[in-house]
Amino acid sequence: MKAYLEAQEVALMEKATINLRDRLLVRLLFHLGCRVSEALALTVEDVDLGRSTITIKHLKARLKLSCINCGQRLGRSHVFCPKCGGRVEKAQTEQQERHRQRVLPVDGDTLSMLKDYIRRGGPVVRDGKRLIFGINRHRAWQIIRGCAEKAGLPKLVNPETGTIHNVSPHRLRDAFAVHAVKLDDSGDGLRLLQEHLGHASFDTTAKYRKVAGEELKNWYARLWNKKVRSDEQKSDGH
């Protein structure tokens, strides 16, 4: 049983979608390798059509602010540092918040799909924000699982735990990472992948090298299984 999706299988999922919104969701999760929470938080303003980039806001961990003078942890409402009494300047807070974002390049085909989606009025206005998708996490899971089933894709196995699970939004992020590692598993390549995925730890990124290595192990196993069967057939023939 497979541990991850191939690019061709993700393409089948795209074809299995019933509308442009769902197709764009599948494409962004795979081509950006972003988390589903990050994709659902995307706004029209996060898309820079001129530079062909998308700004992803880190949502996995709560934003941590600290005083640049003494290192004291700060809350968003703090005007003065409770430890050293220093004034918390707005510019200082904004500079620290920028570390919780990453700007990702977007390929031409995905950018064209985004342009078409925005032009057709796909984004949803909510709380003053023009959200790209305007759906919740549960609905996103339903869409991805439904597309995978419609495309005839099998369930996947977790290479770390051995558990079997349906195709989910995070499996598209995994597919992007494994696809990238197959093309470049050098130290520099993994560092770039770490930055792209927004991993705080390099070890989290490096695990995809191990997952990609499963392909070689499976090939080797099939090779010997075929040889054993062939030898057995010859033996039976004598």
What are these regions (language model features)?
Residues 3, 7-32, 36, 125, ...:
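Basic, Lys/Arg- and aromatic-enriched nucleic-acid-binding interface segment
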Residues 10, 21-23, 137, 141, ...:
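Short, leucine-enriched amphipathic alpha-helices that occur as contiguous helical runs
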Residues 29, 40, 194, 206:
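The alpha-helix within a helix-turn-helix
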Residues 77-95, 109-149, 156-160:
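Major-groove DNA-contacting interfaces characterized by cationic-aromatic clusters
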Residues 175, 221-227:
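Short, basic, alpha-helical segments at the C-terminal edge of helix-turn-helix-like DNA-binding modules
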Residues 197-222:
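Catalytic-site neighborhood detector that most strongly recognizes the C-terminal catalytic loop/helix
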